[in-house]
């Protein structure tokens, strides 16, 4: 359980269907209380229990670093000393999420949802104000109608090629998305410095727009866009595949390598009742949110995307990031080798 906590908050991908107010913080504290109880029952593991408690209360540096894949849940966790990433998928073996009177809008929560955490407050109580068709990392249709409410045992993905390979520090996760007439090959490469996200062979049989969300999180500062070597605040900007585009917010950078789309921020108001029916319909919440996404158009055929997320970075680090050879360390360099229907790969020299 230590892997899914970050700064005493539980990762969204591991909240299950209970996306209630302050769920991340409450479930984080609940875990610490349970661990403290275990310490009184089994003193042989006191060091392990205390390490989890100390880390999440900020008494000690983050531990249990590296990458781990929960293959029975189709979830990848990547932990570094100053940031964490979590990826959730579904397959023909794994039901990725469920609903009922909880998680009413969570239809796409297991279609490649990628969250990155630095201070742990990136998505706090964002759920009533989310565009649930732009969950970070997800490729899906953009419809005007209400998101479908799932049942308890509803399969979400017919794809079987879903999994991960890693050496404990770096790794690659892949997902074949086959759902509702939409097909995509999605891949994520996790390193100590960034997450490289690839999408290929995206096609659908529907006239609905298809988007891939890069990010949708709380706006804490101005959203910045690098233009002619200078960072400028933007509220709404479109980007194309003509050249790489760099964005920055708070402590995280985003570099779009391939694909056209939009980056914008706005104020939204939503209802907690739309997420969990236990809340009254009068209970509104307003949040400032920023969003980055790719627009693949209608009836896409062989569409693709490439982007990088650089958590726990600075403006200067994102501005200077060398795209001709992604920096893994001083001795090793890598580049995107392929991102097609036949192969998605990254070549790392010196391995």
Region spans (language model):
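Extended polysaccharide-engagement surfaces of secreted carbohydrate-active enzymes
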Residues: 2-351
């Amino acid at each position: 359980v230590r892997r899914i906590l970050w700064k005493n908050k539980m990762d969204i991908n591991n909240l299950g269907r209970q996306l209630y107010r302050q769920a991340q913080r409450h479930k984080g504290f609940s875990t610490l209380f349970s661990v403290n109880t275990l310490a009184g029952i089994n003193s042989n593991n006191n060091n392990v229990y205390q390490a989890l408690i100390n880390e999440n209360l900020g008494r000690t540096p983050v531990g249990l670093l590296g990458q781990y894949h929960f293959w029975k849940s189709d979830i990848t966790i990547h932990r570094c000393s100053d940031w964490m990433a979590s990826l959730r998928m579904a397959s023909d073996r794994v039901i990725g999420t469920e609903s009922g009177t909880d998680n009413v809008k969570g239809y796409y929560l297991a279609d490649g949802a990628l969250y990155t955490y630095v201070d742990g407050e990136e998505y706090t109580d964002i759920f009533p104000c989310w565009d649930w068709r732009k969950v970070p990392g997800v490729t899906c249709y953009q419809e005007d109608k209400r998101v479908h409410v799932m049942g308890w045992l509803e399969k979400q993905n017919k794809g079987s090629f879903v999994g991960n390979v890693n050496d404990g520090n770096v790794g690659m996760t892949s997902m074949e998305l086959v759902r509702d007439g939409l097909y995509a090959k999605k891949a994520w490469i996790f390193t100590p410095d960034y997450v490289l996200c690839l999408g290929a062979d995206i096609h659908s049989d529907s006239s609905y727009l298809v988007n891939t969300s890069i990010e949708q999180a709380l706006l804490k500062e101005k959203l910045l866009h690098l233009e002619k070597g200078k960072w400028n605040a933007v509220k709404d900007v479109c980007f194309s595949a003509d050249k790489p585009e760099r964005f920055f917010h708070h402590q995280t950078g985003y570099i779009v390598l391939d694909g056209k789309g939009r980056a914008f921020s706005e104020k939204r108001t939503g209802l907690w009742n739309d997420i969990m029916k236990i809340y009254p319909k009068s209970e509104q919440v307003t949040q400032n949110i920023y969003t980055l996404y790719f627009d693949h158009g209608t009836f896409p055929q062989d569409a693709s995307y490439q982007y990088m997320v650089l958590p726990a970075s600075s403006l200067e680090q994102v501005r200077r990031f060398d795209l001709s050879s992604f920096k893994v360390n001083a001795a090793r360099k890598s580049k995107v080798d392929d991102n097609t229907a036949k192969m998605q790969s990254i070549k790392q020299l010196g391995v």
